[in-house]
Amino acid sequence: MANAPGPEIREKFQAALALSRVELHKNPEKEPYKSKYGARALLEEVRALLGPAPEDEDEPAADDGPGDQALGAGEPREAEGPGAQRALRLAVVEFHLGVNHIDTEELSAGEEHLVRCLSLLRPYRLSLGCVSLYIQAQNNLGILWSEREEIETARTYLESSEALYSQYMKEIGSPPLDPTEHFLPEEEKLTEQERSKRFEKVYTHNLYYLAQVYQHMEMFEKAAHYCHSTLKRQLEHNAYHPMEWAINAATLSQFYINKLCFMEARHCLSAANVIFGQTGKIPATEDTPEVEGDVPELYHQRKGEIARCWIKYCLTLMQNAQLSMQDNIGELDLDKQSELRALRKKELDEEESVRKRAVQFGTGELCDAISAVEEKVRYLRPLDFEEARELFLLGQHYVCEAKEFFQIDGYVTDHIEVVQDHSALFKVLSFFEADMERRCKMHKRRIAMLEPLTVDLNPQYYLLVSRQIQFEIAHAYYDMMDLKVAIADKLRDPDSHIVKKINSLNKSALKYYQLFLDSLRDPNKVFPEHIGEDVLRPAMLAKFRVARLYGKIITADPKKELENLATSLEHYKFIVDYCETHPEAAQEIEVELELSKEMVSLLPTKMERFRAKMALT
């Protein structure tokens, strides 16, 4: 390798790097980029001292694009001789000038410098002295184009970097030089170990950016794979912020939850808990410049966000079990439950092979710590109340943890979503409970946590959330009423207290369904002729349940009963008429529509008989 540049060039270059690392908040308030501009001036001086680019290197053409930087553009060769060494050093300077301009929000100028860097390096891109810088320049161009929302261009640069890394490791394999080494004397060059660490970090960044690009392109399977690989590599190379790593792992768990891959989701969440526990305990490094624990609000927010991911895990696993075991009216099907019990052994037998295929985080003590968390949490669908209760209690623990940060004062929407998840945990647990009185108590708990929210919320600002809560409270009262009716049916002679309770629950359900339906009216209190797609199904369900509730009111007054039947018929008729004029609505409520048609046919006859009976008395 040629001799290192003279001391003046080396000193100016090192001074430029030092200024580049100065954090923006340490600059004067009116000159936030003062250190960046200082670094830029020094880099331009270094470029002038190095002299012009070698004559055999052409300037990049105006239409140079990411495809021109792909691996197929000319055969790479070793960077030997003074001309090649000067080209390499100029490329390093161009790279830092590019990053500098991007940092000061001058994206076009930054792009020009980075493209020039690639142009200088292209003949040597696979050599020991160039490959790391070439990948870094392409990574930065990938980020730049991503910020411009030119995702395909970003993807091309980043995939080119990934391919170059793979080709280099396959054909050469030895740790390449870090770009800064081109400005260091021989005795200050990095060790092989440090070179390897830095190069692997560059590749990890490449995978991280690719994960984001694939996510943006809605290639979710690929995005999850790259995110998982990034997180794994960060642990292997001990290059991560505990708080950031944990939130990324918890976020990845949501992908696996949606895919119903509960073992993988549990692994991500368990790892998130363990790594989050390191926050503030790891000494500051280049990768973690400040102790994250020094930011208490961010710490508690991230803790709350991870807790919410755990809630979703527990809730989705329980709901998936319910879907697998319920009959056509939403009750526990004992035959399906028995079938799933028989499958349990097979699921347990498959666990080991699934675990071997999955990407595991950590080794040694870290792996043991993650496994210790995993072992306390089930990943198989609960098949009875005791198993479901285990998940419910875990979910409820994380509800309390999430609510510590996401309070109604300051985090209205987040707080309400956590409360709704808490309510949903009670609702799905009630499915596994055989005792109807205990099920009633679970719905009562739901109502107790949801009703206060209706007082705190201004529907003018939180209309959508208000509707969701009104509908959910109405449904909870509706379910309680059905349970009380079922309890009364088992009694030979229900007393007046039970009748009064049924009517009270009926009245409360009607109140909240009506509040929901009234929220759909226009400022003149007129119900819409066309119901929006986003509220069509809930609106039709509310109408159907209101019709059914009026038919369930228990009264000794014949006149009142006739009025209730007429109101019930009116709501059933609304559903039938609306679906006739809006065929798309029929697809949303097929079962309810058939029942409504039946009731529209039967109720008038029932009402006529009732009137005839009244006339005789």
From Swiss-Prot:
Keyword Phosphoprotein attributed: yes
GO biological process: cell differentiation; in utero embryonic development; mitochondrion transport along microtubule; nervous system development
Tissue expression remark: In the embryo it is expressed in cortical neurons; expression increases during neuronal development.
Phosphoserine sites (modified residues): S174
Acidic residues: compositionally biased ranges: 54-66
Keywords: Cytoplasm, Cytoskeleton, Developmental protein, Differentiation, Neurogenesis, Phosphoprotein
Cell location: Cytoplasm, Cytoskeleton
Pfam families linked: KBP_C
One GO location term (cellular component): mitochondrion
Listed GO MF terms: kinesin binding; protein sequestering activity
Region (Disordered): 48-83
Keyword Phosphoprotein tagged: yes
Physiological role: Activator of KIF1B plus-end-directed microtubule motor activity. Required for organization of axonal microtubules, and axonal outgrowth and maintenance during peripheral and central nervous system development.
Subunit structure: Interacts with KIF1B; positively regulates KIF1B microtubule motor activity. Interacts with STMN2.
Family label: Belongs to the KIF-binding protein family.
Name used for this protein in its record: KIF-binding protein
Gene: Kifbp
